[in-house]
């Protein structure tokens, strides 16, 4: 049985999560074990995950997850230099020369873990599956204008 462990995000104000309770329900029905970490900032409450049979773990417990667990998150891991075991699904930003990418890869090498970088998740035609949607650019422009306007006062 595949065990998916949804970790709490570490970045301040990061309320997103890559798996909804409905998605967790689908995985559970397919035979997956799903563990979701507590999170003080996640936009989705734990009750929905509980209701579909997910296990709940304390925030930041993923380093102690069973060895066979696949750790799933969106953004970067804590930059504490510890070796990384497990298989991790996340936006690693490690293969295009991004800042900290080589350090992250060395941590995986030291811990024997594996990074499945969502930036490289593609379909059979090579099209990215985990990409920004159509409206992301407009939302980014709106937030930029709002920040600029706030700086003018």
Regions found by a protein language model. Give the residues of each.
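An N-terminal-biased, well-structured beta-alpha scaffold segment characteristic
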Residues: 2-107
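Glycine/serine-rich phosphate-binding loop and adjoining beta1-alpha1 elements at the start
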Residues: 2-3, 79-153
């Amino acid at each position: 049985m595949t065990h998916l462990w949804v970790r709490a995000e570490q970045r301040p104000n990061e309320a997103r999560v890559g798996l909804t309770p409905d998605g967790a329900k689908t995985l559970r029905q397919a035979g997956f074990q799903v563990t979701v970490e507590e999170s003080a900032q996640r936009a989705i409450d734990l009750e929905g995950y509980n209701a579909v049979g997910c296990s709940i773990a304390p925030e930041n417990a993923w380093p102690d997850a069973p060895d066979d667990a696949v750790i799933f998150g969106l953004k970067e891991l804590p930059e504490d230099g510890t070796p990384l075991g497990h298989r991790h699904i996340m936006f690693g930003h490690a293969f295009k020369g991004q800042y900290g990418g080589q350090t992250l890869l060395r941590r995986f090498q030291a811990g024997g873990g594996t990074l499945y970088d969502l930036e490289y998740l593609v379909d059979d035609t090579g099209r990215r599956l985990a990409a920004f949607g159509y409206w992301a650019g407009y939302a980014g422009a709106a937030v930029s204008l709002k920040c600029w306007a706030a700086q003018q006062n």
